[in-house]
Amino acid sequence: FIGYNAFGSLVLGRPENGVLQPAARICTFLVSMAMVGVAEEFIFRSVIAQTLLEHFGTSRAGVWKACLLSGVLFGAAHLTNILSSAPFGVLMQCVFAASLGTLFAAIYFRTGNLWVTVFLHGAMDISSMLIGGLYGTTTVADAVSGYDASMLLSVLLYLIPTAVLLRKKKLPEVQLYWHQYVKK
């Protein structure tokens, strides 16, 4: 998905006769987008998802509940964009973010490594706003306002790998790592 975003941005979204932003602005864009990934992953995976896992336990149902609920909360957090973007676009972003948040929780639970999701999140944010950051042509509010019903495909794109990561055969990996933190 990161490659798809970057390809789409660079090949399909490049403005005709576009002028690159100054290097300082491009660097600011890259750091800003990366830091969104850092902040959101620490809040939603390291604090919220882990707390939910501690509450629900490491049974198969507990892990799934923690992943799904943390994903829904992550999606709901994007409702704040209603202040600057079109309502339907924000709704689509919330659905997209909820399914992505569920996948990121599964990755975090399987690897026990928050930096994996921090990197993926930052790379997705950068790749999705690449043209706006390089050429100054699109704001986050504009991008969100442009989201349409095709974003619903993300539910499948992210929940299928979530199911693969949390399949019954691999659940012992989650339990092995997290037993030291979860008492249930």
PLM feature segments, named:
Residues 89-147:
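Functionally important transmembrane alpha-helices
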Residues 26-27, 64-69, 91-95, 115-119, ...:
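Hydrophobic alpha-helical transmembrane segments
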Residues 39-69, 106-113:
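Membrane-interface helix/loop boundary segments of multi-pass membrane proteins
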Residues 38-43, 47-48, 52, 76, ...:
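Active-site His/Glu-centered metal-binding helix of metallohydrolases
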Residues 122-184:
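C-terminal membrane module of polytopic membrane proteins
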Residues 10-19, 32-33, 80-88, 141:
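Membrane-interface helix caps and helix-loop-helix hairpins in membrane proteins
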Residues 1-7, 71-80, 122-132:
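Aromatic-anchored segments of alpha-helical transmembrane domains
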Residues 16-26, 56-61:
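Helix-boundary and loop/linker segments of multi-pass membrane transporters
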